[in-house]
Amino acid sequence: MFGGSKHIADYDYHVQKAGGDSNAFTNNDYTNYYITIPAPNIETALWLESDRMLALDFSQKSLDVQRNVVIEEFKQRYFNNPYGDIWLKLRPLAYKVHPYQWPTIGKNIDHIAGASLEEVEDFFHRFYAPDNAILSISGNITDEKALELVKKWFGDIK
């Protein structure tokens, strides 16, 4: 999601140029991508997010970079903290048949390392759609202006 789109090669460049920053986090029920940006540059954020939803660029290079990032996050969370791996052991005991039994970040390093580009694309196209998305805007912008910009940048996404 941070590797660019078919139209925008460097997502972070545009966010930073507009005075903002962006990041994401995931839990068992949702993934939150966010941009914090000065109000006069809200349209930049909406342009970037709509393009990411419409034209995400799937490449092996991007997958390899993000896979390494996730593996390092996995190590940090579970192996570089005292008793960090206890959650890997408790989840399957607490949730025998529920998807919560699996850590959001991946079951283990081999599981993460084995993710294929095809699996990532399939997941994206199945779950990253308007029916599964919530767009939230806050700040110094009127409701009318926010709605106008959302229609402009997201209105054609199906």
Regions found by a protein language model. Name each.
Residues 101, 134-158:
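An aromatic/glycine/proline-enriched structural segment found at the starts
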Residues 15, 33, 49, 70, ...:
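Buried hydrophobic packing residues in well-ordered domains
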Residues 3-5, 36-67, 147:
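M16/insulysin-pitrilysin zinc metalloprotease superfamily fold
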Residues 33, 92-133:
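Histidine-acidic residue clusters that define the catalytic metal-binding segment
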Residues 16, 57-75, 142:
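Acidic/histidine-enriched alpha-helical segments
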Residues 71-89, 93:
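Short acidic/His-enriched helical or mixed secondary-structure segments at domain edges of catalytic enzymes
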Residues 10, 17, 28-32, 65, ...:
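Extracytoplasmic
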Residues 1-35, 102-105:
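M16/MPP (pitrilysin/insulinase) zinc-metallopeptidase core fold and M16-derived inactive scaffolds
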